[in-house]
Amino acid sequence: MTDRLNWDEYFAKIVSVTAERSSCHRLHVGCLLVKNNRIISQGYNGHLPGCKHESIIRNNHEQATVHAEQNAICDCAKRGVSCEGATAYVTH
């Protein structure tokens, strides 16, 4: 059966959907952290927790946005899950 996605293709599709959750108006980025072909965390770029979802762009960069990778790593830390040795799949 040749139509089955390999693991990299599979995670690439999932991280693309994750990026669609981004609240950033300039760029939507998603990140998956994967260990042993299992997703241990995911994140997307967006506004700082507790801040108004208002886009403030200076020098072509959003001013109050947390990176997708930061969100995925922080999620692991909050749940006490080690991300050491994980593979990051990032859309951008």
What is the meaning of each model-derived region?
Residues 2-27:
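Short, basic/aromatic recognition patches
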Residues 3-6, 41-92:
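Zn2+-dependent cytidine deaminase-like catalytic core
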Residues 11, 24-29, 60-68:
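Generic detector of bulky aromatic hydrophobic side chains
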Residues 28-42:
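Short beta-strand scaffold segments in enzyme catalytic cores
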